[in-house]
């Protein structure tokens, strides 16, 4: 199991710091495919049929004041499926994948939901 800040996510954040155009990532999706998240990933493993959800974005404190960007979103299943990965995107469709995580499958029935909390923590280590 892994959770990664993707190479595209890193590049977009640096571009924003340099004055480039930037859309804050706040859209969450989930997938049903197998695999281990990698920094080079640009998509989920088999993105599921539900639409991406716009999450609530906030700035939080993990170690030092305001060092964490956080998005919280809840997705509801449209049918029976097992969710194995999730990601944070900068668009409701298409767009760039910033954060991706894979995990042990969570079996869902129609109308079941999962609340995801995705954090990007600035760390000098």
Predicted regions and their residues:
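Small cysteine-rich, disulfide-bonded extracellular modules of the LU/uPAR three-finger superfamily
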Residues: 1-84, 91-125
